[in-house]
Regions:
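Flexible interdomain linker/hinge and immediately adjacent N-terminus
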Residues: 1-33, 148, 154-156
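Short, basic (Lys/Arg/His-rich) helix/loop patches that form interaction surfaces
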Residues: 160-161, 166-209, 213, 228
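Catalytic-site neighborhood detector that most strongly recognizes the C-terminal catalytic loop/helix
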Residues: 211-231
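N-terminal DNA-binding recognition helix of tyrosine site-specific recombinases/integrases
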Residues: 1-12, 19-20, 61-65, 113-126, ...
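Active-site/catalytic core of tyrosine-dependent DNA strand-transfer enzymes
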Residues: 105-181
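Basic, Lys/Arg- and aromatic-enriched nucleic-acid-binding interface segment
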Residues: 32-60, 64, 190
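Conserved tyrosine-mediated DNA breakage-rejoining catalytic core shared by Y-recombinases
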Residues: 69-109, 120, 125-131
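Short, charged phosphate-coordinating catalytic segments
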Residues: 57-82, 205-209
């Protein structure tokens, strides 16, 4: 059995901004990830790459295809600092709708920073040395072990406009096996994020904004908001 993540004190107030929601939630979630992070680190052949990937769905609700489409410039500013308030661009989002994306936690910064440092040492995806930490801002945030771009291929019938990044999907399956949490997948990570948002007092609109779900009813279908207990 795996204990639930520790809850940070306090609840979100109505109207709390999406940026504050994500900051509070990631702070809460990482309390429960420590043991699993250690397993991933010790079992992975690419621990820096895989740890950064492991944190992302819990922190942001991003899907594997969206992760594959992220660029260095989505995460970094030109001066090399973290882009705290970013966007899931329309051409990145699975549903084709732009939405907010926040990078607001030290441990996620450390994981992504260590991975990008490793890329620089390996000479993968480099750009001008004085900008974006020396990386190409238009290049993918995550690359394969030899610096190759993860391929994104059509998935479904012609004209359906559906795509998949199969290598990254398989990497995520491997990472979650290494974490040794039965049933864990990127969708369950998204549901975990939704659950924590509800626990903090977020409503369906706030959940949908962060996770890229436009319809309140679709949010409820994935994970209904718990009803308040009667006194």
């Amino acid at each position: 059995r795996h204990p639930p993540a520790r809850a940070a004190p306090g609840r979100l107030r109505p109207g709390t901004s999406a940026a504050v929601i994500c900051t509070v939630l990631l702070t809460t979630l990482v309390f429960g990830l420590g043991m699993n992070v250690s397993r991933v680190r010790s079992r992975s052949t690419r621990p820096l790459h895989d740890l950064a990937l492991y944190y992302l769905p819990f922190a942001t609700g991003l899907r594997p295809l969206e992760v594959a489409r992220l660029t260095v410039g989505d995460y970094l500013l030109e001066d090399g600092s973290v882009r705290r308030e970013s966007r899931v661009r329309a051409d990145v989002a699975i549903n084709g709708r732009d939405r907010p994306l926040f990078f607001n936690h030290r441990r996620l910064d450390e994981a992504l920073g260590a991975y990008l440092d490793e890329r620089i040492r390996a000479g993968h995806g480099l750009g001008a040395a004085e900008h974006w930490r020396g990386l190409d801002p238009l290049g993918p945030l995550f690359l394969g072990s030899e610096g190759e771009v993860y391929p994104i291929t059509p998935n479904g019938r012609e004209g359906q406009n559906r795509y998949v990044c199969r290598p990254l999907l398989e990497i995520y399956r491997k990472i979650f096996r290494q974490a040794d949490i039965p049933g864990l997948c990127t969708q369950s990570a998204r549901l975990t994020l939704m659950s924590r948002m509800y626990e903090r007092g977020a409503d369906e609109d706030q959940v949908g904004l962060v996770l890229g779900i436009a319809d309140r009813s679709a949010v409820r279908e994935q994970l209904p908001r718990p009803l308040p207990e009667l006194a």
